[in-house]
Amino acid sequence: MDRMQHHFDSAPSKVKSHKSPMAGFDDEFTDIVDYILRITYRIWEGKQIGLCYDYYSDDCPVYTMSGITIGAEEVTQNTLSTLASFPDRTLQAENVVWGGNDIDGYHTSHLIKTSMTNLGGSDMGPATNMETTFLVIAHCIVKDNKIIEEWLVRDNYALAEELGFDVHQVAREKAAIPIQQRLKDWNQSELNRVQKSVTHERQPFLGCSSNDSEGFIKALLQNIWNARLLGDVFQSYSDDALLHCSRNQTLKGREEIAAFYAQIIGTVTQLKFSHDYCCSIPNDNGGKDVAVRWTITGNHGCAGLYGEPTGTPLLILGESQFRIIDGLIAEEWTIFDELSILVQIYRARLSIAE
């Protein structure tokens, strides 16, 4: 089926192939990476927004920490709204890590560097005419040529800051708006799920000599986040490892990376970390790129990153990619919506004030 016949299509058709079977997909797609890259380009750079009707199912949930959409119609409207605020938006694909298959559904972790200019009003405020570049990771489940479920995280803290807004003022204003019922229900179900399923049990170190890259990453995350063994950073990352994270920060070296984990764990008391999906592909350096979608729950129990503690329960949806070279993590991308954490905290402060 040629969906683009008689329609404008500038999407690149030649991409690095991973040779994945594509039963149920349009013949034009050579593999799942080609599918993700081409449909993303067509919708955003090609401005063929109506293709969301073709590539999203009618009941597809898209989970973000600012709200949940259901189905192709809402995805289409959200895309149009974004382009009204940022008409020149581009999405540069940094990597696509994938797992699954064409029978049960593919999972894709799409790391994106997005650039855009704020030429129209947005949910953060009036147009500022400022340019911004920040990171996004979208985890999609794709089956029979359609995205059937998606978890989307973007660095909204960096977005607000680069547009010239006071991030805390934006968070206060968002906190004053009644929370979407879908989001409220999902937040509570996720808090319950993670609290019941996660333990502080330690995992054996699966480092340099292991061929199980996914097991290595899952064990490391369990030990750092849940067992509080932050020192495992020093045996799992290379000396000059890079961590790209919230607020458009790039941290370098084991000390800075360990401090990143310490600040979050120290601020979010009773923290529990759930790795919800993991997959990997070979990289060009003879190692593996590993993607993880994860969830953190806990309480705002210490001042740390976010000021006077409120004790409010916190939910953090995050996605990461790890580049493993010679058995060590050489580079990491960990993205979560830090603005949404502030919104949860300010919502609690408003409730206390009432």
State what each model feature region is.
Residues 1-354:
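C-terminal and inter-domain tail/linker signature
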